[in-house]
Regions:
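Gly/Gly-Pro-rich "capping" loops immediately C-terminal to redox-active cysteine motifs
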Residues: 35-47, 56-97
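Bacterial N-terminal signal peptides that target proteins for export
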Residues: 1-10
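Flexible coil segments in periplasmic/lumen-exposed cytochrome c-class electron-transfer proteins
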Residues: 25-41, 51-52, 93-132
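N-terminal signal peptide c-region/cleavage motif recognized by signal peptidases
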Residues: 19-20
Length: 132
């Protein structure tokens, strides 16, 4: 009887934890299929990345040049830290601020989603398409 209660307790605990795993998956700021098909917001983030020519400092694959490798940085930075860096810059390190850029302020969520997807290895480098 005690074994049955123990197993039932374990099953209950695992069932209670399962929704937490689903929530974590739902917290992903992007949707991607096949490595290059992404949701509309993430696609706008990629377009913003390209329009601002961010690859001049961070590399075409976000692996860094004179600027840091964003595929590593976005593994550590929270969305709030990323937003703060984009809007305020890091002048001491050569990172300009973009708080006056309408393109950035309107697409900051998409830019974060794109770079986070790259850092997570879910989004492949190169041209993206909209996920339909």
């Amino acid at each position: 009887m005690k074994d049955t209660q123990f197993i039932a307790g374990i099953a209950f605990a695992l069932a209670a934890l399962a929704p937490g795993y689903a929530v974590a998956a739902d917290d992903t700021p992007y949707e991607v299929a096949g490595g290059n098909k992404v949701d509309k917001i993430t696609l706008e983030g990629w377009r913003t990345w390209r329009a601002l020519a961010c690859e001049r400092c961070h590399g075409a694959r976000q692996e860094g040049l004179v600027g840091p490798p964003l595929v590593e940085s976005l593994k550590r930075l929270s969305k709030e830290e990323f937003t703060q860096t984009m809007l305020k810059g890091r002048p001491e390190k050569g990172m300009p601020n973009f708080d006056g850029s309408k393109m950035v302020t309107e697409n900051i969520d998409g830019l974060y989603a794109y770079l986070k997807g790259r850092a997570d290895g879910a989004i492949q480098p190169g041209r993206l398409e909209e996920l339909k």
